């Protein structure tokens, strides 16, 4: 029981620390090359430089909360696409595991492999925290440092409405 308590305390500290130091609103998109679920390299800074893009972080593919978060965005895909939102999901999983996750749940967006924590570091966040970031023309305009699971798409759509008319 004592070990569980210590583990919970450490996780809470890491999560609160990552929220305190997270990428600030108005910051430019991180410039970093990343590996996609297709096994290709993507210049994330360039991908976020034009239009509206969502980057959402989830701790681990195939786990219940992460499935709910990704499937929420999948289910909101048509409405997000109607608003021309590009979506990128990030976890510490390998590109192969991300591809399995994408295929199993029919995810229509690109997943990024962050096995070394470089993407999380570029966003100044913990690898294990669930967060979401909206960029417009390469600038961070909205962030959710305690991103929802099953309500992720709804929260992003509300944020887009609040950021209108430029959405």
Positions of predicted regions on the chain:
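Short loop/turn microsegments at loop-to-beta-strand junctions
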Residues: 29-30, 52, 128-131
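Short active-site neighborhood of thiol/selenol oxidoreductases, capturing the structured segment around
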Residues: 44-67, 73
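Short, internal strand/loop/helix patches
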Residues: 88, 99-131
